[in-house]
């Protein structure tokens, strides 16, 4: 092998090594920042790493919303039809937030309570987020509840 060929081979190997390292770093960063959607049943069953950040999806249980006067601290429960999980947040809730509506909350589990740092609510009476509709559909089929097809956007 001539010196020119050897030098080219070294550069090619260095380029491959650098691109492999960059790919691995990007994959690790994305994995740390990804937040999977779970239902209350999956959380209570232990399908979620207690230390990880994730999204909780379901319906706000009617009669569960509580916010002390003059406080941003809100407490409510989310259900998927099988189980209920208490949620607390100190953030401003969206205008469309209401009991009996679909929500997706992002946060962490602490002492059996989901502490949300973001709460998203549906934006009209027909809309349910696709991931929530799919997971709620499983609970509906399990309990023989007729499933109405939500408008998915």
Swiss-Prot record:
This is Cytochrome c-type biogenesis protein CcmE. The chain crosses the membrane at residues 9-29. InterPro entries: CcmE, CcmE-like_sf, NA-bd_OB-fold. Residues 30-153 are periplasmic. It comes from Stenotrophomonas maltophilia (strain R551-3). Heme binds at residues 123, 127. SUPFAM superfamilies: Heme chaperone CcmE (SSF82093). One of its GO terms (molecular function) is heme binding. It is found in: Cell inner membrane. Belongs to the CcmE/CycJ family.
